């Protein structure tokens, strides 16, 4: 007999509108952070981390979408940060504007476009109360959020007198 090791996935009709909106906000929040943090791409990542920690206790549905949004933002934030600092180095320290840098900018642009498309799809699906799994990050988020916790894992410590 196989025991299910994951919590049941909530269905759209079981979710409150507020949960759907909070899950959608995990994906759309990056657009607001993008406007404020365009020259500093790490601000998007900081905003995603804050959003996750604020909303992780609301429901498994919101926590899943917040974590998936956060994890999927990690690679693009790193790519963007490298592009910004590499570009600043070229501008301020008279390094050459090479074909390698141009190719890297194309890579960063394509990665950001893919991230934006997936984020919009994820936001629409979350607003409908549906689960949407990104290629790698969806599985990691699902396993992290929906895995059942062992009941004996968090035993309370017993107070003891000091050793004599």
Q: Which ranges hold each PLM region?
A:
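Membrane-interface extramembranous regions at the lipid-water interface
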Residues: 2-37, 43-71, 122-164
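Hydrophobic alpha-helical transmembrane segments in multi-pass membrane proteins
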Residues: 18, 22-45, 68-119
């Amino acid at each position: 007999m196989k025991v299910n090791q994951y919590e049941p996935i909530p269905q759209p009709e079981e979710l409150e509108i507020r949960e759907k909106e909070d899950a959608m906000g995990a994906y759309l929040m990056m657009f607001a952070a993008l406007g404020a943090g365009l020259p500093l791409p790490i601000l998007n990542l900081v905003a995603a981390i804050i959003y996750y920690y604020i909303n992780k206790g609301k429901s498994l549905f919101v926590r899943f979408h917040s974590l998936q949004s956060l994890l999927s933002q990690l690679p693009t934030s790193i790519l963007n940060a490298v592009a910004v600092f590499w570009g600043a180095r070229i501008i301020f320290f008279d390094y050459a504007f090479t074909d390698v840098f141009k190719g890297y900018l194309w890579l960063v642009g394509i990665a950001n476009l893919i991230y934006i498309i997936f984020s919009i799809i994820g936001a629409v699906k979350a607003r409908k109360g549906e689960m949407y799994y990104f290629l790698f990050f969806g599985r990691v988020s699902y396993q992290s959020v929906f895995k059942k916790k062992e009941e004996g894992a968090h035993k309370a410590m017993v107070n003891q007198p000091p050793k004599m």
